[in-house]
């Protein structure tokens, strides 16, 4: 699938790399599954970069429009899964 991730050009290079890894983790949760701790670790880093709930919702909406994958649903599923288990949507 070819599409552009929602990125804010005010983010540093390191933050952009982190965000791309986070988007890839969400894709992985939908496509193959991902270990809960890996996804939640990237989500914690995502929240450091995007602390605002409104901005998080905006990014989720933009990402869902281009990819079809919901960040919100993936994180909700991860919160329901036991530690060291696979998050698969």
UniProtKB/Swiss-Prot annotation:
InterPro entries xrefs: BH2638-like_sf, UPF0223
Entry similarity comment: Belongs to the UPF0223 family.
Source taxonomy: Bacteria, Bacillati, Bacillota, Bacilli, Bacillales
Annotated protein name in UniProt: UPF0223 protein BCB4264_A4064
One family name in Pfam for this protein: UPF0223
Protein species of origin: Bacillus cereus (strain B4264)
